């Protein structure tokens, strides 16, 4: 069960990734975590990555693919894995294919931009505890105050509307070609592509994923 997740920030991808990991016992592979782990372990690939990063350069696709290949041979990937945040570009997707990394399912979480903006911009945080509220979906008992301490709630910088809209534009620019790429791959019988309606309740989305993944 080798899965790629696609979806804008706020589309509910993280919540469903957790569900898939727990239900099917497969790890989520994040390229950022992988790079940090390789550097820390001092492996041959890790040392190469460190050299590039220390020079302030971006790690090459070839190196990331090599790390992914190495990572998926680990024991915890025996039943599959979940790739989040990779591939980001067509050359990366092509490189994965050339490296023989087969993908069984591509899951795209589809939520209209306006709903994503509402979901993210409405978040309020109690910074000391990390408790998160939402002005519409999960409001505090007293507006603008933490339920437990009565302290002031704040908005994270990343949750401000201008930032969210900018991230959405970037997401669509980057992901539209990937959606087309994997739709074509699915039509050729090389993978299965599923567009998931992410506007529904978390439990409904999870139930659909369980049906798709079996």
Curated annotation (Swiss-Prot):
| Region described as LID | 122-159
Q: Got any disulfides in this one, which pairs?
A: none
Q: Where is this region: NMP?
A: 30-59
Positions annotated to bind AMP: 31, 36, 57-59, 85-88, 92, 156, 167
Tell me yes or no: is Iron-sulfur among this UniProt entry's keywords. Answer: no
Provide the reaction this enzyme catalyses: AMP + ATP = 2 ADP
Q: Which GO terms describe its molecular function?
A: adenylate kinase activity; ATP binding
Cellular component aspect of the GO annotation:
cytoplasm
Q: In which pathway does it act?
A: Purine metabolism; AMP biosynthesis via salvage pathway; AMP from ADP: step 1/1
Keyword ATP-binding: yes or no?
yes
Gene3D superfamilies noted in UniProt:
P-loop containing nucleotide triphosphate hydrolases
Free-text note on domains in this protein's UniProt record: Consists of three domains, a large central CORE domain and two small peripheral domains, NMPbind and LID, which undergo movements during catalysis. The LID domain closes over the site of phosphoryl transfer upon ATP binding. Assembling and dissambling the active center during each catalytic cycle provides an effective means to prevent ATP hydrolysis.
Name the UniProt record assigns to this protein: Adenylate kinase
Please give the organism.
Erwinia tasmaniensis (strain DSM 17950 / CFBP 7177 / CIP 109463 / NCPPB 4357 / Et1/99)
Gene encoding the protein: adk
